[in-house]
Curated annotation (Swiss-Prot):
This is Paired amphipathic helix protein pst3. Residues 9-27 have a biased composition (Basic and acidic residues). Its main location: nucleus. Residues 111-181, 252-322, 403-472 form the PAH domain. Residues 1-71, 91-110, 199-249, 321-376, 797-824 are annotated as: Disordered. InterPro entries: HDAC_interact_dom, PAH, PAH_sf, Sin3-like, Sin3_C. Residues 228-241 have a biased composition (Low complexity). GO terms for cellular component: chromatin; cytosol; nucleus; Rpd3L complex; Rpd3L-Expanded complex; Sin3-type complex. It comes from Schizosaccharomyces pombe (strain 972 / ATCC 24843) (Fission yeast). Pfam families: PAH, Sin3_corepress, Sin3a_C. Keywords: Nucleus, Repeat.
């Protein structure tokens, strides 16, 4: 049959095929000019490379092929696929052995696979199916799947056998692409029917002399079993000759898992670092690489494992069957020049790592490599002739496993079912990893079942797998035995020597039952080792600070420059010797000298050119020394000069950094104080400290009671004046704030100290600070805050909530109440309870938010440090006379804050005291900066300014009632809303004591009562005012309003009020005035109201109802009118005449008729 040849048209190629062809052509050899011409005239070859006499002839007239015929494009695609398959099967894309066709793919005759054989087979396929394009395309698809490892070897054999049914020459010719150990034979059975027989590494085809003795009985059951079994799932079987000679004495085959278990057993017996284990691995590697006899390996292993007969017996399972019965001197043994098969079917561990690693599941590539290595034992040496018979596929029958380590039929069925259910090979590998983890006892049955259920996501299969692994859902019973509470105190044990103590009999544990006499004589159960701890040795740890780190960074940079410059300088000296004109005369001596100094030159080239190009430059230097040396020398000199110039520039910066940080780096005391202040004086840390104490009091931890969380005695008023003196010095030298801000900050600090702590300040000093803001001189001593913070004139400019409140004395006077007996009401003796007895000297109260609390705490910290220094200097006569006393310290601090004294001089002066307390003043600059920052934050927030105004009007009264304090607190809460947490700073002027308490809405304003009567009166006062009663759970309070009568302000109404400019009326829509006075008895709780007193509450919410409320109101009106006009309304039980009369009569007529 003639085959028409069509010239290749590259423009018609598929772009995807072009890319694949281009990537695969990199592996193909260059074609001769005769092969590159078109049309191609090529002779066809069979699988053996012999000419079959069929050749193509050129056709002069081009004919248009039908769609069913094979075109030239299809042939080129096929050439690309089979060529790349042949080459990639020998070596992968990266040069390594592929996992599908591992260990050298070759033909069945042990002849290396050639690309020409693959192309010849493609020519043969094209010859037979030139008019049947669909079969040719199906063949290319099979080859693509085989190349991408989508099909295993048995799968591609089955598909090719079905595709080429009736073409035995093509079926047997496919042996060209099969890995070693796999072989296809087409033979004729006794009934003149062609039979396709497949040989695998685990099931090799029997020899021809035994074929007549052991016929293969085909069956449908065997065929199904063979099709569902992959090479990795196949079980080892004895070959046909061994079955004929001896079936009873056959040695059981071992699988891959047993090989891993054997290696782990050897590791457990002999550690990986031991000489025995390394010698055993060396024997295995020698057997793999060198041409050693299997008898030599056995003798060497027997010598290594002479003390472990069990390991030697297990090792014999991995040897071939004829080793035990045949001696090395037998003349029948034929020594093949090829390499011998490996011992067993396990891969050798690497020799580089010496430490033992954790066992991991074997990769699929390792399994395939080990199987392919084992397949060499069964490689056939004789080649079967090709016959032309019809095709009937009858796979080889699988016999029952005979190895005790082999899988049973139930396990084979289980693995087959699971693999068919899993979507891909990756999921099956995950399943194998789970089994490996379970085998290594890293997973129990429950964890294995849970992981398997997540992997397969099939309830039936999970239930079957649980029965297969015999999982039981019985709960695990753990004995609840108490832990031994013995305390390990080696100091109490008997001392045997300096480092050993003898254990008491009660501490001795039960000995292991597996010990023998040798173990008991060697192992120690009576003594323990204790490290000695001399009393004079202290563990001194060195703490690095930021200044020391800066110096270390400078030294690292200087070291890098020195290392680079020393390397380049040495390289320049060496290369200068190779640039002489007479280098050609003694070139060999120069190369030897270059070899000795290769490391120095390479380091210099890496610095100049980088690692990537350094090796290339070094190779060029060795090859062309006379020409390359001057070029490299010039380049290295140029970079050396640049780096030296850069080092000189950086040296100036390094000197400045060292001068700035040298003293501070070694002043460890200052670094510790600075780091402590940076953490302890932070905003969040101060709030967290008081909140921790509050939580301990609230939950009664360690018997704590509710009360103040912070208390400090501030008895020296002169220290407050010193704080103001240092703050003025700091503000004078500060460039962070403007001139106006400096005056306001100083005025706020002075006014706060004078009003809250009662510090008598000179009036001129306060007026001077206020004049900096163009404020009029103060009239009274306590009007400083009112001059700094402008009081809001109306509710329009205030930041209050929608409930208006009165800050004057009206409300406090109207909300006056007392506790009298009902019998005293007639006598109007309530003045007794309104007199001086209701007044208590409780000190000044200042309610503020977290910012105010942090400011007071910072002032206390500054006071505490100055007080400690003053007490230390006054108590020590030596420092008082030598350093000038406390006043001299203040002068030095003032000079330091103003900038006339350097930081180094200031620290040297403080070091004279040699006291940690005095040295705390070194961070006074940072402390004052934080105080100024908090005051500036108060100036920027209008709400905080209102808090100071409230304190000036309500809080700064030493003689007040509890009810007035509650009203003052409610005012503060309304200003700070929605912020719920407030702080109460209380100053007791007689005791000179400051107490701070954190308050939540449910906490009481006052908590220290002398007797229960005082507590009851406090409750009555809280109940009488218009705000929420303190100490009452709001969840238990039932409001006396119907829910349907309450209407809220909608967002639409709010927007309407804002657009109309009437937003102030929206906030003031609630009006409340409490003037009602009542009296009740403490015994009977009978309430008596005072005449001519009342409470007024006005709610104008109807002005701001939304559209939905209006529609509801109209609907109610319409429904009411409909009912009124109906028969059930006013017409009910009336006569028709009356109805007609009332319908026609107007309201005026009705009135006149009446």
């Amino acid at each position: 049959m003639d085959v028409m040849n069509v010239p290749v048209d590259s423009e018609r190629d598929n772009p995807g095929d072009k890319v694949e062809t281009q990537s695969d052509k990199n592996h193909l050899p260059k074609a001769s000019p005769s092969q590159s011409q078109s049309p191609v005239n090529t002779s066809l070859h069979n699988g053996d490379g012999k000419d079959n006499g069929v050749a193509t002839e050129p056709v002069e007239n081009k004919q248009i092929l039908s769609e069913r015929s094979v075109t030239r494009d299809d042939y080129e695609k096929g050439k690309t696929i089979v060529s790349s398959l042949a080459l990639s099967s020998i070596s992968g894309k990266d040069g390594s052995i592929s996992s599908q066709n591992a260990e050298g793919l070759s033909s069945s005759s042990n002849r290396p696979l050639d690309v020409n054989d693959a192309l010849s087979y493609l020519e043969l396929v094209k010859y037979y199916f030139s008019e049947r394009r669909e079969i040719y395309n199906r063949f290319l698809e099979i080859m693509r799947d085989f190349k991408s490892q989508a099909l295993d070897t048995l799968g591609v054999i089955n598909r090719v056998s079905e595709l080429f049914n009736g073409y035995p020459q093509l079926i047997e010719g496919f042996n060209t692409f099969l890995p070693s150990g796999y072989k296809i034979e087409v033979q004729l059975d006794s009934s003149n029917t062609s039979v396709v027989r497949v040989g695998t590494p685990m099931h090799p085809l029997p020899q021809q002399g035994v074929q007549s003795t052991l016929p293969v009985a085909p069956s449908n059951e065997d065929q199904r079993t063979m099709e569902s079994t992959s090479p990795t799932d196949s079980q080892p079987q004895p070959s046909a000759p061994n079955l004929v000679s001896s079936t009873e004495n056959e040695k059981p085959r071992v699988d891959f898992n047993y090989a891993i278990a054997y290696m782990n057993k050897v590791k457990a017996r002999y550690p990986p670092n031991s000489d025995t284990y390394m010698e055993f691995l060396g024997v295995l590697r020698t057997y793999q690489k060198a041409q050693k006899s299997i008898f030599e390996v056995r003798a060497r292993v027997a010598e290594i494992f002479k003390d472990s007969p069990d390991l030697l017996e297990e090792f014999k399972l991995f040897l071939p069957d004829n080793v035990d019965s045949t001696e090395p001197s037998t003349p029948n043994v034929q020594k093949s020049p090829n390499r011998l098969p490996p011992v067993g079917n396990f891969s050798l561990p690497p020799s580089a790592p010496v430490r033992e690693k954790r066992n991991r599941p074997a990769h699929s590539a390792q399994i395939s490599r080990s199987i392919s290595k084992t397949s060499r034992m069964y490689r056939q040496t004789a080649e079967e002739p090709l016959n032309s018979y019809s095709l009937h596929v009858y796979p080889q029958k699988i016999t029952a496993p005979t190895s005790p380590y082999a899988a049973t039929q139930e396990e084979l069925l289980a693995f087959t079912t699971i693999r068919q259910h899993l979507p891909d090979t990756l999921a099956f590998h995950k399943f194998l990893e789970l089994l490996h983890l379970y085998r290594e006892k890293l997973l129990d049955k429950t964890e294995l079942l849970n992981s398997f259920s997540k992997l397969v996501r099939n309830d039936n299969l999970t239930l079957w797998f649980s029965e297969f692994i015999r999982w039981s859902d019985n709960p695990i019973l753990v004995k609840n035995e108490p832990v031994d509470e013995r305390v390990y105190l080696p100091e109490t044990f008997e001392c045997i020597s300096l480092t050993y103590r003898k254990l008491p009999d009660s501490w001795k544990q039960d000995k292991c039952s597996g010990r023998d006499d040798l173990d008991n004589s060697v192992l120690n159960d009576d003594y323990i080792s204790v490290a000695p701890k001399p009393s004079h040795v202290k563990n001194i740890m060195h703490h690095e600070n930021q200044y020391l780190q800066a110096l270390q960074l400078v030294e690292d940079e200087r070291y890098d420059y020195d290392r680079v410059l020393n390397t380049t300088e040495s390289a320049i000296k060496i290369l200068a010797n190779f640039c002489e004109p007479t280098i050609h005369e003694h070139l060999e001596t120069a190369l030897q000298e270059l070899e000795r100094s290769k490391r120095i030159i390479k380091n210099a080239l890496i610095i100049v050119y980088g690692k990537e190009h350094a090796n290339l430059a070094l190779d060029t230097l060795f090859k062309k020394l006379p020409t390359a040396a001057p070029v490299l020398l010039k380049r290295i000199k140029t970079k050396d000069q640049e780096w030296r110039r850069s080092k000189r520039e950086w040296s100036k910066i390094w000197r400045q950094i060292e001068k700035k940080n040298a003293q501070a780096a070694f002043d460890d005391r200052y670094c510790r104080i600075e780091g402590r202040d940076r953490r302890g004086l932070s905003y969040s840390r101060i709030l967290r400290d008081i909140d921790d104490i509050y939580q301990r009091q609230k939950h009664r931890i360690d018997g704590a009671k509710l009360g103040f969380q912070f208390t400090q005695v501030l008895c020296d008023s002169l220290i407050f004046l010193n704080i103001l003196r240092l703050s003025d010095a700091q503000l004078t030298n500060s460039s962070f704030y403007s001139y106006a801000d400096k005056g306001r900050i100083s005025a706020v600090l002075k006014a706060l100290l004078s009003q809250f702590f009662g510090i008598p300040l000179p009036r001129e000093a306060l007026e001077t600070n206020l004049a900096s803001e163009n404020i009029e001189s103060v009239k009274k001593h306590r009007d400083g805050l009112s001059k700094i913070f402008i009081r809001p004139e109306s509710a329009d400019n205030s930041n209050n909530t929608n409930v208006s409140f009165q800050t004057d004395e009206t409300q406090t006077e109207d909300e006056t109440m007392s506790d009298i007996h009902p019998d005293d009401v007639e006598n109007h003796s309530k003045s007794k309870f309104l007199g001086e007895e209701s007044k208590n000297i409780i000190g000044y109260n200042f309610f503020g938010n977290a910012t105010m609390y942090v400011l007071f705490r910072l002032i206390c910290v500054c006071y505490s440090r100055l007080e400690h220094i003053k007490l230390f200097v006054e108590s020590s006569t030596i420092y008082a006379s030598s350093t000038g006393g406390y006043e001299n310290i203040l002068n030095i601090c003032e000079k330091y804050l103003k900038g006339s004294c350097s930081r180094l001089e200031f620290r040297k002066y403080l070091q004279k005291f040699n006291n940690e307390t005095c040295y705390m003043i070194c961070s006074i600059e940072r402390l004052l900066k934080v105080i100024f920052y908090r005051i500036h934050e108060i100036l920027l927030d209008p709400k905080l300014g209102q808090l100071l105004l409230l304190f000036e009007s309500d809080g700064a009264n030493s003689v007040t009632t509890p009810r007035e304090q509650m009203v003052y607190r409610n005012h503060v809460e309304s200003i700070l809303a929605p912020e719920s947490k407030i702080f109460n700073m209380r100053w007791y002027p007689l005791e000179k004591r400051l107490c701070i308490q954190q308050l939540l809405p449910a906490d009481l304003t006052m908590h220290d009562f002398e007797n229960p009567a005082k507590a009851f009166m406090y409750y009555v006062d809280s109940y009488a005012i218009s705000h929420i009663t303190e100490g009452v759970d709001l969840m238990q309070v039932k409001m006396p309003f119907l829910r349907r009568s309450l209407q809220r302000i909608s967002q639409q109404g709010y927007l309407a009020g804002r657009g109309s400019g009437r937003l102030h009326s929206l906030f003031n829509e609630h009006f409340c005035k409490s003037n009602l006075q009542l009296f009740f008895s403490t015994d009977t709780y009978v309430i008596f109201f005072e005449p001519n007193t009342e409470n007024v509450y006005i709610n104008s919410y109807n002005l701001w109802v939304d559209q939905s409320s209006q529609s509801k109101k109209q609907n109610r009106t319409t429904n009411w009118r409909r009912w009124l006009e109906s028969d059930e309304g006013w017409r009910k039980s009336k006569a028709n005449t009356d109805i007609k009369f009332f319908s026609e009569t107007t309201l005026d007529q009705c009135i006149e008729a009446m």
